[in-house]
Amino acid sequence: KDTNGDDRADIKEVLFSGWGVGDTHAGPSNLRYGFDNWIYGTVGYARFNGSIGGKQHNFGMGVFRFKSDASDIEFLHQFNNNTWGLGFNTAGDVFGSTANNNPTFYGGIPATIYNGERKMSAKMIADTPAFHPITPNIRQVDAFNAYTAGCGHAFATSDAFPEKYRDRAAFVCGPTGNLVGSYNIIKKGAGYTAKNAFSFVASADEWFSPIVAEVGPDGHLWIADWYNFIIQHNPTPSV
């Protein structure tokens, strides 16, 4: 809290600790306010291992939520990689994206429902992880021509979008392909399936590295561009 107007925090309060710091791109991200008044977020393999309210928690690679007073935290959806995307449709269903060819997941039943029993892992619902850059000059070293660094998963919930997009199109960034892709999220039984809908934005600028795309207060799509030729931690390929 800034108490004297100098734009610096004079009062700092640690809500809880326990986040792994061994790898910066595997830590927590995507904090956002949920429909249920909890704060949601994602974490990668750096994990969380700490005690809150007298209860020990240890989880990683998926979606969590916590109360704003830090009195409780819950791990909700188990994904299979560093999780960099998080989104909700208007029904409040939870979706996400991860590294390594996993651009869209549906959370499904929260892990808290199982009361300590074996938890169900979320499944990737995309028909294909392929993306569609408009230049051959892209840099990837572990997965090729696909969402190796999928991040963001915002839905087109604004009336500013054409009707065919509303609450159906999800925007997943592919910084290693210099693009923002989209998937059509389609109801299927008790879950969803996702159909690749090509690129929503793509650039031939090799430094264009979108890392999140969200619907802004004006109803339009806002894009955060890291703008860096190297977006990953991986070494320069030898071939």
Q: What are the functions of these language-model segments?
A:
Residues 1-239:
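Beta-propeller domains with acidic blade repeats across secreted/periplasmic ectodomains
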